[in-house]
Amino acid sequence: MELSESVQKGFQMLADPRSFDSNAFTLLLRAAFQSLLDAQADEAVLDHPDLKHIDPVVLKHCHAAAATYILEAGKHRADKSTLSTYLEDCKFDRERIELFCTEYQNNKNSLEILLGSIGRSLPHITDVSWRLEYQIKTNQLHRMYRPAYLVTLSVQNTDSPSYPEISFSCSMEQLQDLVGKLKDASKSLERATQL
């Protein structure tokens, strides 16, 4: 697992008993799992009274580092020995390593389901439909009459059985800009395949 320097620093701060006592460490670890696995979780998970003495910037940095490591561990399907080795490298003590591994094992199945639902490929555009709409906006200062295009992209994702649609509204200039960029992308792709 390769983690950025920022994540490593945040994780090392989390390992420091002077920054996070045992209770604060447990609360932050559970908050990291909760924020990843619970769709209704919000920033309030970090508002526990036992975390108030910690600088909010440090708290959020360590929370993000823990969440990143949890996701990476889940992505690589890390086992207890892999987790322990990395945590030891980050100067975690035995008690914190055991707590982290236990919490990870308790949430491993939910984490794998979450990661599996994200998918591995970008959606593929299969169809485009559009219609012209005329917008009339009036107020006391001015009137604006202009055409707008309602564009709907039908997409298909190989990882997901559902085929959602992406809809947006744009002006003629924005649509021309989009078409120009798509033509440029198409030409670049053609050149790349000819090499």
UniProtKB/Swiss-Prot annotation:
One of its GO terms (biological process) is sodium ion transport. Residues 124-193 form the COMM domain. InterPro entries: COMM, COMMD3. It is found in: Cytoplasm; Nucleus. Its main location: cytoplasm. Widely expressed with highest expression in thymus. Scaffold protein in the commander complex that is essential for endosomal recycling of transmembrane cargos; the commander complex is composed of the CCC subcomplex and the retriever subcomplex. May modulate activity of cullin-RING E3 ubiquitin ligase (CRL) complexes. May down-regulate activation of NF-kappa-B. Modulates Na(+) transport in epithelial cells by regulation of apical cell surface expression of amiloride-sensitive sodium channel (ENaC) subunits. Belongs to the COMM domain-containing protein 3 family. Component of the commander complex consisting of the CCC subcomplex and the retriever subcomplex. Component of the CCC (COMMD/CCDC22/CCDC93) subcomplex consisting of COMMD1, COMMD2, COMMD3, COMMD4, COMMD5, COMMD6, COMMD7, COMMD8, COMMD9, COMMD10, CCDC22 and CCDC93; within the complex forms a heterodimer with COMMD2. Interacts with NFKB1/p105. Interacts with CCDC22, CCDC93, SCNN1B, CUL3, CUL4A, CUL4B, CUL5. This is COMM domain-containing protein 3. The gene is COMMD3.
